[in-house]
Amino acid sequence: MFDLSLNFIRKVKRNLFPFYKNKELKFVFKTLQQGYPDNIVAARFVGGCVRKYLLNDVIDDIDIATILNTNEIKEKFKNSNFKVIDTGIKHGTVTLVSENFKLELTTLRKDVETDGRYAEVEYINDWKLDSERRDFTINAIYLDVNGKIYDPQSGVLDLKNNNVKFIGNPETRIQEDYLRIIRLLRFAIQYNSSNDQRTINALKSNLNGIKKISKERIFNELMKMLSLKNFYNILKHNNKKNIFLLIFPELKHFHRLEKLNKINKFLKIDQYTLLSILLIDETDNLEYFSFKYNIPNDIKKKT
């Protein structure tokens, strides 16, 4: 009952006070738009913030796609209240930081060459082309500062139907960045999505590519997955559970998860405790996993 009330409150708040009407955000978009005619859109929100806005979820990070390059962005905000940080110049990304916001701005781009881990990119001003290089349709929904949706990959419909799917050919998307295998699992669990056999086959046939990904990126993605409120949904999908265990064979004690699921609503179990539950046994399983993924000492103390 409480969850329904909370969701209703968020929905009312979204309709009456949408996040994009915030004065600071409007200033950012007005600044980016300066020098361009009204028929050219200089910037749009994209990714998680748009997805969460449409689902009435709490927005905890904001990504902005723009036709401006990083030098142009820095020039426009050099005398503003925002501090500009070079967080990913090589990939066209800077971060604007103020007292209230941390905004990641990335120039529209397309991949020229990929190796399964990193991509060489070319900067563009074509919104549809930019959408085609993204991972999932639900992450390629754009929103302008006036609340108008641009949805070239039909992500809104997929989001409504809890359908997490790759843009275009699953094999191609995965081979651009093998971390997308784990990301697909995370989003599919989060939205309780049933994926088609073509996608499942693509995940399985490309598992070896995960070896190309840094251990830190893999572990960070795992912790995001374990922090999901509905991580237990993985128990409903044998295909996803089996793929998860192929990637993380040390997290093998799923029988414990099945028992926990029965009382989960009465417990508050964080991702570190959950990691421990799936790992710890009478062997050196935990120690091996910690070594394998270079787990920092502060996290080791929590497990």
Features from the language model and the residues they span:
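Catalytic cores of the polymerase beta-like nucleotidyltransferase superfamily
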Residues: M1-T303
